[in-house]
Amino acid sequence: MSSELFDPKPLVEIKEAYRKNKKFIRHHSDRYKRVKPSWRRPHGIDSKVRKRCKGEREMPSIKYKKPKEIRHLLPNGLRKVRIFNINDLTPLTSLNRFYCGEIAHAVGARKRIAIVNRAKELGICLLNGNARLIPEIEE
């Protein structure tokens, strides 16, 4: 992976692009209380929304996709990489300006502590670095 490919855009541009995104609400959710606003694709044979008639609600489509440079970016401007063991941290040492790690759910407590300590040594940002860590009991 070359760093010029993943040059992070300024956060202002990212937030500006995400501000433009359209909220799609379900057809007739404003008309009936029983119809919740979360998007469902219309399937009716005479549905004006499904037929894409003029003046009706827009349906989600490929034209609303985000630009490639900012797709999958987190609010801090980094991309997320899942980490399963300590060896997954080594590629992130040179790319820690562009990527941050997220420890996978299946990783146990012993490995999780080792990953967190190694990430601190290497200066890698972890999204869930303090999640599910068992504090050591002093005797």
Curated annotation (Swiss-Prot):
Keywords: Ribonucleoprotein, Ribosomal protein. GO terms for biological process: translation. GO terms for molecular function: structural constituent of ribosome. GO terms for cellular component: cytosolic large ribosomal subunit. It comes from the Eukaryota. PROSITE patterns: RIBOSOMAL_L32E. Belongs to the eukaryotic ribosomal protein eL32 family. This is Large ribosomal subunit protein eL32. It comes from Encephalitozoon cuniculi (strain GB-M1). The lineage of its organism: Eukaryota, Fungi, Fungi incertae sedis, Microsporidia, Unikaryonidae. The gene is RPL32.
